[in-house]
């Protein structure tokens, strides 16, 4: 099921009012939706936008794709920037353990072995030889 963040039109004729909803991409524009996450009133001066940031970030992290207009609203509210930061932080923390997960061997340099031991929190003498450091691993 492909999930979208999009606008659902409400309001009277010539008086548009939109709800920002999470909906299955196959459902009609004003049809069934999963959850309401905000409102958008373009008639008000200035345009009135209310968004539930926590719910939107949750849905974005679960793979929901915003429509073009919803993307503009989220971008202007700063939610997409926060999502990009969260995603980058998650990616960088996931990459660090993978790099230090491999145990050093004889082929590694002393600096690489010391970096591994520092990441593990192991104490060692700064003047230790390579063989002594490998014994600590």
From Swiss-Prot:
Q: Which superkingdom?
A: Bacteria
For this protein, the record's Pfam families field holds: Ribosomal_S16
| Alphabetical list of InterPro entries matching this protein | Ribosomal_bS16, Ribosomal_bS16_CS, Ribosomal_bS16_dom_sf, SAP_dom_sf
GO terms (BP aspect): translation
Q: Which UniProt keywords apply?
A: Ribonucleoprotein, Ribosomal protein
| Any one GO CC term of the record | cytoplasm
A molecular function (GO) held by this record is:
structural constituent of ribosome
Would the keyword Endoplasmic reticulum turn up in this protein's UniProt record?
Answer: no
The answer, when asked if Aminoacyl-tRNA synthetase is one of the entry's keywords, is no
Regarding protein family, the annotation reads:
Belongs to the bacterial ribosomal protein bS16 family.
Protein name (Swiss-Prot/TrEMBL): Small ribosomal subunit protein bS16
Origin species: Leuconostoc citreum (strain KM20)
**GN (gene name):** rpsP
């Amino acid at each position: 099921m492909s999930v979208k963040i999009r606008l659902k039109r409400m309001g009277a004729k010539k008086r548009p009012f939109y709800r920002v909803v999470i909906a299955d991409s196959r459902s009609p524009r004003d049809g069934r939706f999963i959850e309401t996450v905000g409102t958008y009133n373009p008639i008000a001066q200035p345009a009135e936008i209310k968004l539930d940031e926590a719910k939107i970030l949750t849905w974005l992290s679960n793979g929901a794709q915003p429509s073009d207009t919803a993307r503009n609203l989220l971008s202007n509210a700063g939610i997409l920037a926060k999502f990009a930061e969260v995603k980058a932080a998650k990616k960088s923390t996931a990459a660090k353990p993978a790099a230090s997960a491999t145990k050093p061997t004889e082929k590694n340099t002393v600096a690489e072995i010391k970096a591994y031991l520092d990441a593990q929190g192991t104490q060692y003498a700064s003047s230790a030889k390579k063989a002594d450091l490998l014994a600590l691993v």
